[in-house]
Amino acid sequence: MVRLIMGLKGSGKTKKLIELVNDAVDSEHGDIVFIERTAKLTYDIPHKVRLIDASQYNFNGYDFLKGYISGLYSANYDITHIFIDNVLAIIGKDIDVDAEDFFEWCELFGIKEHVKFTMTISIDINKATERICKYF
């Protein structure tokens, strides 16, 4: 399952994501991962969640992010949910075909490995393509 939370900067996406993380901690029985661009949410995310500061790595494209996620999962098969805050900013790109392909890859990975993905992206909902719309 892939879920996108979309909206412009300041629309409450990260706040909603934090609420969903807290709900997941209470309701899910596996491990939870949260990837953010910087370490600014260290005190907002429960300590049970594996918090990853993406600025410590060179996330220079979706292929790297796919490999990183695959590596996380191969090291810990108990991961049930991966949250990514502002995935476009982590990669450093706007919404494009590569982003759409990444979301589809996450969907297929999630089905195969029983992992949920919840991500935020900072774009106007009206600019979402059909391939993006199915995730929110």
Region locations from a protein language model:
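Conserved P-loop
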Residues: M1-G71, A128-E130
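Generic beta-sheet signal
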Residues: R3-I5, I32, I79-I84, F117
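Short loop/turn elements that form and flank the Walker-type P-loop nucleotide-binding site
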Residues: E28-H29, I45-H47, N76-D78, K112-H114
